[in-house]
Design a protein with these regions (language model features):
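Accessory nucleic acid-recognition modules appended to NTPase machines
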Residues: 1-154
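Active-site-adjacent loop/helix micro-motif of nuclease/hydrolase catalytic cores
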Residues: 165-173
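Domain-level recognition of nuclease-like catalytic cores that cleave nucleotide substrates
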Residues: 191-216
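Short, conserved loop/helix-junction motifs that constitute active-site signature segments
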Residues: 177-180
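Short, hydrophobic beta-strand segments that form beta-sheet elements in well-ordered domains
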Residues: 182-189
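Conserved beta-strand segments of alpha/beta enzyme cores
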Residues: 134, 184, 200-202
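Structural signal for conserved beta-strand scaffold positions within catalytic alpha/beta enzyme cores
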Residues: 65, 85, 137, 160, ...
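Active-site ExK catalytic segment of metal-dependent nucleases
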Residues: 155-165
Length: 216
């Protein structure tokens, strides 16, 4: 399927190179894209070539590139994008995760969950914000971090993503809330009901995400 999609776009990459790159990239899912590390793992090709491969898979809608949110805060911000596979079935296949029970306890389980939420946010944004919002992540060298930030132009909404039925947030979460002056912040987790963390932050079940987005 992937090979056919690329051929339809007029892109010809040797099959061995294609699958090797995707397998390597799968281990960066949900993490900062590191072109230099991938270049070494691919046998010494240039980071520029690795970045070009990533752009090809983004254009083919196989991979999503989430850019960092830049605001003039006088802080040192992370500048590399994060990468997510749009099809988690493909991601799991590349990671040799065959069944749901294989995912439990897997080192990539949390990143898989993060990808599920990010993909859902991206898909639902147009319904909740009239197509005018943009999706980013936020991270500073000092440790402030938010997995996803929706900027509508009139407000910013933050989302921290935790694969835990008893999620806890760190100081970095609260620092990000302050840095970005978020109107609301949610910790999206596999929980059955929501509960407040503050007057502007709450833990949110994944199943409630669509309703929350449509209310903004």
């Amino acid at each position: 399927m992937v090979r056919r999609d690329l051929l339809a776009l007029g892109i010809t990459i040797p099959s061995e190179t294609l699958w090797r790159f995707l397998r390597m990239l799968a281990h960066q899912h949900g993490q900062l894209f590191n072109a230099s590390a991938l270049a070494v793992a691919m046998g010494g090709i240039s980071p520029i070539t690795v970045s070009r491969y990533l752009d090809i898979f983004c254009d083919a809608l196989i991979v999503r590139k989430l850019e960092p949110y830049f605001v003039n805060l006088g802080k040192r911000l992370v500048k590399s994008p994060k990468v997510y596979f749009r099809d988690l079935g493909l991601l799991h296949a590349l990671l040799n995760i065959g069944q749901a029970h294989d995912l439990q306890g897997h080192p990539m389980a949390g990143y898989s969950w993060e990808g599920l939420v990010i993909n859902h946010l991206a898909a639902q944004m147009s319904q909740g914000f009239g197509g005018n919002a943009s999706l980013y992540f936020y991270r500073t060298s000092a440790g402030a971090e938010m997995d996803a930030v929706i900027d509508t132009g009139s407000e910013r909404i933050g989302f921290e993503i935790k694969l835990s039925d008893a999620p806890r947030v760190t100081k970095g979460f609260w620092n990000a809330c302050d840095d970005l002056q978020l109107s609301r912040a949610y910790v999206v987790a596999p929980v059955e009901h929501a509960w407040p963390l503050s007057d502007k932050a709450q833990v949110l079940p994944f199943v409630s995400l669509k309703q929350v987005l449509s209310s903004h």
